[in-house]
């Protein structure tokens, strides 16, 4: 797999072969992430999933392609078996293991995949503490391995649950919402500091669940190693109305200069 330090990278959050080909040709993306919801949104049928994964891996060559385990209710053995099948498809596949709050099953899966030298991307995390435990679980994994913070969903988690008096009453063991969990930017800063102070090169932090361009800027400014972005939002990074107007001014000036000939 291509040696990239992933200290400041963009991944494409998509399963569209067309979009992945387009953006990979620009040279700005260092990887691809996808999941079942993205595949459904992109119009894939069940029969198209594996062939599409193969195409994506070929397009990305040796850049990482994160593919998610398909059933969080499956047994440890079933999850490990599925992960091994994915790795047989292509060596640049990173297995996405969902954080599962109900028990320690995901930690067992992560450990077994590490023993098999299968790199992972621990996903669906909303708070600092989840990221810490996932980071410790994969600190000795093969590189590249990742942990993923869901930016917009983290905000939803705070607004809908963690700031609710009823939720706090029913889940006293979680404690009050702290400053580090008050915003995904704080979570990002906290996790990057945790990894640096611990001397951990693995994992790298991916920030996903990005809904708009402003969140991309916030995530990188907070220190995210990687931001994974949907094609439409990535395209919107190029936009500024003043840039459009400035280009029009320059074009008009050139046409005026040509008239002097």
Residue ranges and their predicted role:
Residues 2-21, 25-29, 34-112, 116, ...:
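Active-site beta->alpha loop and helix N-cap motifs at the rims of alpha/beta catalytic domains
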């Amino acid at each position: 797999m291509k040696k990239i330090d992933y200290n400041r990278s963009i991944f494409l959050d998509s399963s569209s072969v067309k979009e992945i080909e387009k953006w990979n040709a620009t040279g700005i993306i260092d990887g691809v992430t996808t999941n079942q919801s993205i595949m459904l949104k992109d119009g894939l049928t069940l029969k198209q999933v594996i062939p599409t994964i193969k195409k994506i891996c070929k397009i990305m060559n040796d850049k990482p392609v994160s593919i998610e385990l398909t059933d969080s209710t499956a047994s440890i053995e079933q999850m490990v078996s599925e992960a091994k099948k994915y790795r047989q498809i292509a060596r640049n596949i990173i297995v996405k293991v969902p954080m599962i709050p109900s028990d320690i099953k995901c930690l067992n899966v992560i450990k077994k995949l590490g023993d098999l030298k299968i790199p992972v991307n621990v996903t669906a995390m909303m708070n600092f503490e989840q990221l810490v435990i996932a980071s410790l679980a994969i600190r000795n994994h093969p590189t590249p391995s990742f942990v993923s913070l869901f930016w917009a969903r983290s905000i939803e988690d705070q607004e809908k649950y963690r700031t609710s008096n009823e939720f706090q009453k029913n889940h006293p063991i979680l404690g009050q919402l702290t400053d580090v969990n008050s915003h995904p930017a704080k979570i990002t800063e906290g996790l990057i500091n945790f990894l640096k102070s611990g001397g951990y090169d693995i994992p790298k932090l991916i920030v996903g669940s990005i809904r708009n361009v402003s969140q991309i800027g916030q995530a990188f400014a907070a220190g995210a190693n990687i931001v994974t972005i949907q094609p439409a939002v990535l395209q919107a990074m190029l936009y500024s109305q003043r840039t459009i107007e400035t280009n029009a001014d320059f074009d008009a000036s050139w046409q005026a200069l040509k008239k002097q000939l």
